[in-house]
Amino acid sequence: MSELKIKAAKAAIAYIEDDMVIGVGTGSTVNFFIKELAAIKHKIEACVASSKATEALLRAEGIPVIDLNSVQDLPIYVDGADEVNERGEMIKGGGGALTREKIVANVATQFICIVDESKVVKRLGEFPVAVEVIPMARSFVARQIVKLGGDPEYREGFVTDNGNIILDVFNLSFSTPMALEDSLNVIPGVVENGVFAKRLADKVLVASASGVNNLK
């Protein structure tokens, strides 16, 4: 599986141009992308990290990291996914960085999703949806999610980079992913959720034994 993740990471490097500021996601496939990026770090201007973990990895490779607030133009964002379909709709957030990932993805002109073939699905929903929640609202939000048909589980011992908690929600209906994304976000106490149906991936680079294909 690591070989496929490396393939996908290498394929994303082809989209990196000189003097670019690059948004960098979070997760195991992205970690391989960071390794590849380190080889051309002299060509790029800097990176914007979607998590403290990614920032630490970038800095360890000697890659400059800048704050998103100092960026006016972010041409590209590279990130993985827990699930992705052919339309570029995704479930993300298994690593708990979903809020910052969604922010950086929305700032970027182009969102490139890098995955191995196991992440490609016809219908989203096997993987639970991570929901970032203000701690005091945990029980209330969980009750509201149950009303939506979901089964929330508190992610024990995990605190997001924003100081919040995560509810992992199983068995949600994905008949209309965009409506689901909205219905979760309007619950008071919800910061963000891991359904990416409004900000789609522009390119989905899928690695398999036969090579890397663009799903979109």
From Swiss-Prot:
GO molecular function: ribose-5-phosphate isomerase activity
Entry's EC annotation: 5.3.1.6
Annotated GO biological process: D-ribose metabolic process; pentose-phosphate shunt, non-oxidative branch
The entry's keywords: Isomerase
UniProt-annotated binding residues for substrate: T26, G27, S28, T29, D79, G80, A81, D82, K92, G93, G94, G95, K119
GO cellular component: cytosol
Pfam families per the UniProt record, alphabetical: Rib_5-P_isom_A
Active-site residues (renumbered): E101
Pathway: Carbohydrate degradation; pentose phosphate pathway; D-ribose 5-phosphate from D-ribulose 5-phosphate (non-oxidative stage): step 1/1
UniProt catalytic activity: aldehydo-D-ribose 5-phosphate = D-ribulose 5-phosphate
Gene3D superfamilies, sorted: 3.30.70.260, 3.40.50.1360
CDD domains for this protein: RPI_A
Function: Catalyzes the reversible conversion of ribose-5-phosphate to ribulose 5-phosphate.
Family (UniProt): Belongs to the ribose 5-phosphate isomerase family.
NCBIfam families, per the entry: PRK00702.1 (NF001924), rpiA (TIGR00021)
Classification via PANTHER family: RIBOSE-5-PHOSPHATE ISOMERASE
Subunit structure: Homodimer.
Stored HAMAP family: Rib_5P_isom_A
Protein name: Ribose-5-phosphate isomerase A
Taxonomic source organism: Legionella pneumophila subsp. pneumophila (strain Philadelphia 1 / ATCC 33152 / DSM 7513)
